[in-house]
Amino acid sequence: MKEKVIVIGGGLAGSEAAWRLANEGHRVILYEMRPKKMTPAHKTGNLAELVCSNTLGGLELTTGAGLLKAEMQKLGSLVIEAAKVARVPAGGALGVDRKIFSEYITEKIESHPNITLIREEVKEIPEDEVVVIATGPLTSDALSEKIKELVGYDTLYFYDAIAPIVEAESVDFSKGFWGSRYGKGGDDYFNCVLTEEEYKKFYEELLKAEKVKPKDFEKAVHFEGCLPIEEMAERGYKTLLFGPMKPVGLVDPRTGKEPFAVVQLRKENKEGTLLSLVGFQTKLTYKEQKRVFRLIPCLRNAVFVRLGSMHRNTFIQSNKVLTHYLNLKKKENIFFAGQITGVEGYVASSATGILAGINAGRLARGEKPLKAPTETMLGALVNYIVTKEGELQPMNPVFGLLPPLEKKVRDKKKRKELMAKRALETMEKWIKENNLVPEGLVKVC
């Protein structure tokens, strides 16, 4: 039996971390507070309970989630194994029977000889042990306080405010100009220009658009200083013109005049292939976001890789406190995994659990932790959350995070196919070089 590792949280990420560590021969103590103490969203005491959708996203390798799932399978993912056992028809997506899925994972964890499952709320972090914290978006108040003390009070967030992100190549750059306010900061922003007539149409449709109904446990959340754009619009016709759409300090070089209104797009990655809509956090439904935001002239044909949202979500500013290994910069024996790291979605959460498990095990054995290659979707996603400049908001796996191909490929589908091929080949090489798949860990269902 190898060294002990503690995992706090029995969701998707915690289950993956525990499974990985146990199969490497470590003695794992897994803490899960349910069913003794429930969250407002969970209904059972099962491990890896899915509280939102019952699909794990698309299977196509040309989608971010599909590619990440393929990488996870190569790493011996328990979540992918369970999803295949519990699979239900869901078109091109990997849909599962929630009950079968969570019961399968619970049984696997409970019956593993190297895992001790303790059903208790953790109120203190054992800072002298190797620990993986994977407590998710609804981390208990007591543990949240301890995490705050550990990472710093300004680096633990309790809600997210996600603005949409579009593919740069889908933006019509003839409908605006690059530049910063008052000429400061260079060409950091692309300014989508709206005439008064275009603004009026956008404003009216924004007010009419359907919103997502908040869950009961989210109703008390106040987004101080970070209002949804539709709520700002409800305060009056000109409110947005003094907020995220203000034209002050910007001169359109095509006219020599200040535009009536602008929507600023900011680069989300170094390559500039992804652009976010600045200040456009929203609670509109996904369908309505696409309809309304495409009324902005430069976004008429926009391809959205992430849509906006605002909801209750406990997560850390990983870019300030974590390394590429998913451990704390200041305390290398403490790892984080799952949604609490600032990744979005079931698959991304699960994948970070695998990586945290790999590196917690290596550290416990006195070995050097490993950085996942950025050519893989797992490596690219982790690289994003730990290196993002400014404020981190949750991110899902998208192709725009991957480094470009050495040779430029114009056809978008072909480009994604080649990126996926490179990612899987890189993952296989990384696994082989570092002996990352213990015998019997990968099961074909």
Swiss-Prot record:
InterPro entries per record: FAD/NAD-bd_sf, MnmG-rel, MnmG-rel_CS, MnmG_N, TrmFO
Cellular component per GO, a single term: cytosol
Pfam families in UniProt: GIDA
Keywords: Cytoplasm, FAD, Flavoprotein, Methyltransferase, NAD, NADP, Transferase, tRNA processing
Domain of life: Bacteria
Ranges that cross the membrane: none
Record field: catalytic activity: uridine(54) in tRNA + (6R)-5,10-methylene-5,6,7,8-tetrahydrofolate + NADH + H(+) = 5-methyluridine(54) in tRNA + (6S)-5,6,7,8-tetrahydrofolate + NAD(+); uridine(54) in tRNA + (6R)-5,10-methylene-5,6,7,8-tetrahydrofolate + NADPH + H(+) = 5-methyluridine(54) in tRNA + (6S)-5,6,7,8-tetrahydrofolate + NADP(+)
Compartments in which it is found: Cytoplasm
Needed co-factor(s): FAD
Ligand binding (FAD): 9-14
Record-listed E.C. numbers: 2.1.1.74
Main location: cytoplasm
GO biological process: tRNA methylation; tRNA wobble uridine modification
Role description: Catalyzes the folate-dependent formation of 5-methyl-uridine at position 54 (M-5-U54) in all tRNAs.
Protein name from the UniProt record: Methylenetetrahydrofolate--tRNA-(uracil-5-)-methyltransferase TrmFO
Source organism: Aquifex aeolicus (strain VF5)
